[in-house]
Amino acid sequence: MGSVRQITVFLLLLVTLTVAAEDIPRQGCRRGTPRQETALRRAQYPPFRCGGDFYKGTRHQLVVLASFKDRSFQGDENATIEQWDKIFNTKNLSEPPFYGSVHDYFYAQSYGLFDLVFDLQYVEVDECKKYRSTMDDDENSQYLVDDVLEVLSTRDIDWSLYDWNGDGYINQLIIVFAGKGSSYGSFGGGYDTIWPHQWRLNEHLDLTTSDPLDFRDACTFESNGNIYTVDVYCAVQEIGSKGGYDSFGTICHEYTHCFGFPDFYEGQKMYVGQWDLMDYGNMNDNGYCPAGYSAHERWQMEWLEPIELKDPTTITGIHALSEEGEAYLIRNDDYPSEYYIVENRQPIGFDTKLPGSGVIIFHIDYDESLWTSYDYMQVNTSYRQHYTIFPANNMTSISSGSGWAYPYGVNNSLTDTSQPAAKLWHESSDGSLLMSKPLYNISVDSDGLASFDFMEDASAIQSVEHSVIGSQRWYDLQGRLLPGRPQSKGIYIVEGRKVVVK
């Protein structure tokens, strides 16, 4: 009888673990109160957008370490500033369990284009319960931003450093609050704590009025004769579920929301899982090694330009995305905003803890209104998905994500008849819901370099001298048009094909 009980308990535990892998309880990161009149109200605020041309160069970012009257950081003020300065700013941070600092993360995703300097300010605000989240919203967190700004208004701060494009708006404010948040259930900080999230002040309800649909304004103040507005912010807990600084991945996730990116999960349902920072990839290695940006995310940030394939060709020597900005785009000709993006993901840098490695093929049906919607979690829903991965193992469950990269076993192709098939959401030129632009012979060699044949009549990579091609346009691997023939050795793109100049 005891053995039967043990087997029963084991099976129940197994079922529980399986369910947990698929349906980890999660709430959205954007939890203000949606409203229909948002489009009208937003006329006075910068519109939501993903990325922008100001995410390059050296940029200063203000980070506020907010201690509560009833809840302090693990160390005193000096120790806290020292610890978080290390987590945010140390270049090439290699102190276990960290795989790098926050600076390192974004420097790596941008291929060195985005060099962040985080300026830390320590403040003390009211008791934590004043700002607590409920199961429905984060409306109380607006008071945390208000109280933080009230303290900062008494300090000599050069706010112009945080207005990256000179429009009078502080691009975003990061708040790290003391203790745990409410996002870890029984392992969290309890009822009177804050759910880590990102939002805008002007999307918060004005709780001082009796009108349930009266929304507040952002915070505007004067500094050194200039008027600045703080609207976009994110708030993240100091301590993670394990009691350490495993909130690192959550910081990268919420900060990326500030850049305009949505969640790719829907409540408990995940769609790209550990392969993407904006799904469950922020929790890779318990949050210390969040997944790197996908090629699509880097493209939106203007850190990468995918190469569109139109004619039959053979692509070889594709480096890991974490090392070089090389990715390929295959478009639905009859619906240009639907496309596949092919990228090589290897266990390098912040991709070290991905569930697998190989060629990942994203299927993206891009709709800017969904990506930038105030109504969070609209990109992927149970009835419609706009950002997914073709699973090479033909298994969409997140627990099977280790087999999503190509090649998988004997499956090294994505065609109209493969499993999975090269499906579309919108009809192609032949009236079908199939791409009809097959990828064959997908492979990764012992050096981690990927290759594939695009369409059946593929052309091998050419090795040429400078004089072979003269009048055609040359592009580098970032998609930049060269003024003429390249003057140095390397790999270039000519007429949609990779060309090696020796």
Model region roles, listed by residue range:
Residues 23-35, 40, 74-112, 117, ...:
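Non-catalytic C-terminal accessory/binding modules of secreted extracellular proteins
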Residues 491-502:
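C-terminal tail/sorting-segment detector
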